[in-house]
Amino acid sequence: MWHKRIIEQNPYPVDNLVGKLLSMVSQDKEKIHEVLSSPRQIVYSKAACVLNGVQRLKKAKENKEKVLIAGDYDCDGVCSTAIMKYSLDQYGILNGYYIPDRVKEGYGLQVHTVELAKEKGYSLIITVDNGVKAFAAIEKAKELGIEVIVSDHHQIEEPVPVDILVHPDLMEKEYRYFSGAGVALQISYYLIGEVKEMIVLAGVAALGDVMPPFAQTRPLIQKAVQYLQEGYMPALQKLVPKGNQINVQIIQFSIIPKLNSLGRMSHLANVNQLVLYLLTRNEEAQIKMAKQIDHINQERKKVSQIKAKELEEKVQDQAIEVLYDPDLLEGVCGLIAGRITNKINRPCLVLTKTDGDMIKGSGRSIPGVNLFEALKDFEFYEAFGGHEQACGLSVLEENFSAFENYVAEIQLAVNQEVGKEALWIETEDFSFQAVQSLMKLEPYPSEWKNPFVWIEHPSQIVFRNYPSMQKYEFEVNGEKVEAVLYANKGIQADSKATNFIGTLSMNSFRNQEKIQMIIEDLW
């Protein structure tokens, strides 16, 4: 159900459309002020944990030690690994890296990886985007005489038994919203100085992990977009469809899904190859690998769309949906959970059966429901981690019924009706300039999303039908709008629709800008 939000006054010194949207999505004036403020400069942490990590790496160079970078298979983990690999190479430290197979090995530093590192002659391991829960692997490293630097941003639940932990909780307040790549960037800076390509990787990773775009995370993302537009990191540019200008939305919906696809579709590709792709300067190799990445992403889309449709039919009226399919690819659980969460406007867990008797999967939440806090107290997890808006978990099949009962028991704690709101647009507030101003405020915090607007009875409506989408062209206050309804929204197109709800953006194609609406609903 949609609620029409009518806001009479604009309390901010911006276009009426922008000010009213900000009033709708947040009452936090401090955060709104930060979004409206001029872009800030990137400043690097001087925290002791960062400097201690840097000093240990410098010592490794002096001693001619071999350093193993232990990464992760999602966008943030791959970008973190690439940042650390590039930095150690440039500084002259002997190093290698390894990202585990999502299905066969699971998340984080594993005991067998530590054992293999010992066989290969590594004396120091640095984790990136993981490590705060790798207790068994850290213990094994101590037994084998290998030192471990944990560089991570995930929530710390128990003390991490390492001498050097580099983590936002131990850094200045400005860095509290960093992803794993943001943490890796701090170490990189003190080894090789500021490198624009590394800023791009860290900014893209922050978007990939949906980090709150405040404090030092905000200029990091803004600079990443700017440097990508200026031509830095051509490997990432090759993941953007030709003719499209790079912006936050292009990164979120084109670059990041492709970077994530190799980890999700681990039966088709080795995610470790993605680090080579990001760092290679060979254009021919970039072009070849970009095509392969695109192919894998297309396969990921096919699988997730088919399975999402099947699981949507199993949705019941629960506050937290628990959907199980034993034949589902583990790597697409989070994608499907996110899609269903957006559709039903409730938290959703999507789980599958892996080798043996283990059930694993991912969950996604909605603003106002902290999924991590809601689920963290179940006593029979084999593995559990995440944050407010997302989680990953593993339980033995014999404990799955107990888990379902546990979720059912916490229903009342999160059973809140969160209606979807859309700002009703007054015709005189709508202009090309206003939508341009709105785009300059990106990236939006995840709790704001890209705010929905409600356009009622526009003029000059023209309907066009395409294989994967439908388009409506219409005018509002004399401004032309192209409204796009994608097939994967699961909404029936109506050529006679006069009410359109969706998000606004500027679509730049072949140097021509036009107002675009991505339709969320219509009638």
Feature annotation, model-predicted:
Residues 425-427, 504-506, 523:
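Beta-strand elements of well-folded, non-transmembrane domains
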Residues 423-481:
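Accessory interdomain/linker segments of ATP-dependent helicases and helicase-like nucleic-acid enzymes
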Residues 4-124, 144, 192-405, 418, ...:
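Hydrophobic helix-and-loop "lid/oligomerization" segment in the mid-to-C-terminal part
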Residues 413-419:
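Non-transmembrane, aqueous-exposed alpha-helical and coiled segments at domain scale
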Residues 510-523:
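OB-fold/S1-family single-stranded nucleic acid-binding modules
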Residues 496-510:
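Flexible glycine-rich surface loops and low-complexity tracts that mediate binding to linear polymers
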Residues 117-118, 127, 132-211, 217-220:
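Conserved phosphate-handling catalytic cores of large alpha/beta enzymes
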Residues 478-492:
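Beta-strand/loop nucleic-acid-binding surfaces
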